[in-house]
Amino acid sequence: MPHYVGLDVSQKTTAICVVDEQGRRLWRGVCATDPEPISARISKYAGVDAKVGVETGSMTPWLVHGLRGAGLNVQCLDARRVKAALQMQLNKTDENDAEGLAQIMRTGWYRAVHVKSLDAHRARALLGARAQLVGMTTRLSNMIRGVLKTFGLLPGAGRGLRFDRKVEALLEGAPEIALVVRPLLATWRQLREQIAVFDKAVLQQVRADPICRLLMTVPSYTGIWVTRRSGGAC
């Protein structure tokens, strides 16, 4: 007899509910949000052949890959569609939501969502962190330009090392403004150093991936673009 399992995940605990093919509740409980204790309870109360459903969320990739690694049949469900179905419940609790997910798995009224590999998520995190620092350097350079323009000092349209040198040259004759601008410029330099660290990590990742190496043979394709495209497809 097939069993169906619903998981309602929060940061610390996960509510688990097991139902049979008739919709009868067989077991319901709570355990720590970790693949090992969750898989142990599912195997004990539902069996390794049970169909398990979990909503999309920030912790979903880690849990799904961990549970699949334990041999469980786990489906990731679109949270927006699940929310519409669970809104019909009178009492909204984690345990009831887990039972609702189990019933959705039983009826088959769900849309499975692809869960990208952990390697793809690592590439995405790397590119996201780099993008944040690039945005911060842009905002800092714009602020430096704005402060200098207020006092008639124009660094021009240079970027990178050229911008750095122009600002330093302008500050030599304006010590009062240097008190404000130099700390900003020092922070800007540190951010660029960290961006260079990320760039090196991206290139290492590209060299280790045969697909990325192949894409890099296309003219004008950069390591950042190749990593973004290959990571989004996994």
Residue ranges and their predicted role:
Residues 1-234:
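A detector of single, family-specific signature residues
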